């Protein structure tokens, strides 16, 4: 369908095959409908809380490289518009992965997936169970619409240029481009990545009030109606920001934001 870290993604058919050392591009199946189908079983087991690893649009199987915080990945949710082509054999250029682009940028797919997730959470709540989401806010992914290193969003209606694509991107300050001048664009890949990984651009909160505001909006959005999840598990919470002082201040703001929207919400930092 598309490529990830210089190789094509693939579906695993033989579950007896040992996982690869770099298994991030192999997919084993499963979606939110599958969770719904197993709710009777989970309830019979006495499960009280369902904690999901990241569910937002992301290209890897682990999904700790968020592509779009606003939407549940249609591969997990609902794909109504499935136009376009998969990558041809030997082609690793995701500008040609038009089926993947359609699946994850088409508004009908994205809205339908969010709607399905809201219905799933309501059903889980009806059964007396709770839902925790995984929040990955220290870094995003290079596929993220704010960065758009794969040029998936470039030129598409409803999307602004990513910071990799244009020096004039509204998301430029979301990332640290190491003092780069405008002559290094378009397509500037010289940015700070978490632990040096260019697939995991570190978010530069101290230099972007807009970024902080957006992430706090996301924190509020998913614990509010119509989704009403019951809390956040926070990935690498201690790494967020570039100083202990900012880190502490941000998480206090995060807690205040979440608790104002949902006073009973759980916040659990890694």
Segments the model singles out, each with a brief description of its role:
Residues 224-241:
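Surface-exposed extracellular loop regions of Gram-negative outer-membrane beta-barrel proteins
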Residues 53, 269-270:
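Short His-Asn-centered micro-motif
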Residues 230, 264-269:
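Acidic/polar loop patches that form or flank catalytic/metal-binding clefts of enzymes
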Residues 241-249:
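Short glycine/threonine-rich loop-to-helix capping motif typified by GTGT followed
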Residues 1-48, 55-226, 254, 260, ...:
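Substrate-binding/active-site clefts of carbohydrate-active enzymes
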């Amino acid at each position: 369908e598309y490529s990830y870290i210089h190789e094509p993604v693939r579906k695993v058919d033989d579950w007896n095959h040992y996982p690869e050392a770099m298994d991030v591009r192999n997919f084993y199946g499963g979606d939110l409908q599958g969770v719904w189908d197993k709710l009777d079983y989970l309830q019979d087991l006495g499960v009280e809380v369902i904690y999901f690893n990241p569910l937002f649009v992301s290209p890897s199987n682990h999904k700790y490289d968020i592509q779009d915080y606003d939407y549940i990945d249609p591969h997990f949710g609902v794909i109504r518009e499935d136009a376009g082509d998969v990558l041809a054999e030997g082609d690793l250029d995701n500008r040609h992965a038009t089926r993947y682009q359609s699946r994850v940028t088409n508004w009908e797919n994205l809205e339908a997936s969010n709607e399905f997730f809201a219905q799933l959470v309501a059903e889980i709540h009806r059964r007396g169970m709770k839902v925790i989401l995984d929040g990955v806010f220290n870094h995003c992914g290079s596929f993220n619409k704010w960065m758009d290193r794969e040029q998936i969003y470039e030129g598409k209606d409803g999307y602004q240029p990513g910071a990799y694509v244009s020096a004039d991107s509204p998301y430029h300050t979301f990332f640290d481009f190491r003092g780069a001048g405008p002559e290094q664009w378009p397509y500037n890949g010289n940015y700070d990545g978490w632990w040096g990984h260019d697939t995991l651009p570190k978010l530069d909160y101290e230099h972007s009030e807009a970024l902080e505001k957006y992430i706090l909006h996301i924190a509020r959005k998913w614990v509010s109606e119509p989704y009403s999840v019951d809390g956040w598990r926070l990935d690498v919470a201690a790494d967020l920001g570039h100083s202990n002082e900012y880190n502490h201040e941000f998480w206090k703001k995060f807690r205040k934001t979440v608790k104002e929207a949902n006073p009973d919400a759980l916040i659990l930092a890694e």
